[in-house]
Amino acid sequence: MAAKKMHVKKDDMVMVIAGKEKGKTGKIMRVLPGKGRVVVENLNVVKRHTRPNRVNTQGGIVEKEAPLDASNVALVCSACNKPTRTGVRVLEDGTKTRFCKKCNETLDK
């Protein structure tokens, strides 16, 4: 399966717009473009029962973040602090940058 074009990047602040974590915000830790999913810090936490191994000699129940579908998160604009859709703008020097569709502010610095 080909990698999907993602509207968010690592370290972006996002708000969950659908699902059990709806309305919560967090920072993106990982982007999985092959699956179209993102891992958001301290959201969608699941418990995994792990066996003892060389890394984790104790074993037991481990809590970790599970991936969310990228369509269920919206980028939070740093200027207006609202979840927003983004557009792409080409600057004078030819570089592409994302901008907020609500306040028209540049998101990438």
UniProtKB/Swiss-Prot annotation:
- State the InterPro entries in the record: KOW, Rib_uL2_dom2, Ribosomal_uL24, Ribosomal_uL24_CS, Ribosomal_uL24_KOW, Translation_prot_SH3-like_sf
Q: Which UniProt keywords apply?
A: Ribonucleoprotein, Ribosomal protein, RNA-binding, rRNA-binding
The Gene Ontology biological process annotation of the record reads: translation
The protein's superkingdom reads Bacteria
The record ties this protein, via SUPFAM superfamilies, to: Translation proteins SH3-like domain (SSF50104)
- Kindly state one GO CC term assigned in the UniProt record: ribosome
PROSITE patterns from the entry?
A: RIBOSOMAL_L24
Write one Gene Ontology MF term. Answer: rRNA binding
Say which family it is in: Belongs to the universal ribosomal protein uL24 family.
Q: How does it assemble?
A: Part of the 50S ribosomal subunit.
State what this protein does. One of two assembly initiator proteins, it binds directly to the 5'-end of the 23S rRNA, where it nucleates assembly of the 50S subunit. One of the proteins that surrounds the polypeptide exit tunnel on the outside of the subunit.
Q: What is this protein called?
A: Large ribosomal subunit protein uL24
Naturally occurring in which organism (per UniProt): Syntrophotalea carbinolica (strain DSM 2380 / NBRC 103641 / GraBd1)
Q: Gene symbol?
A: rplX
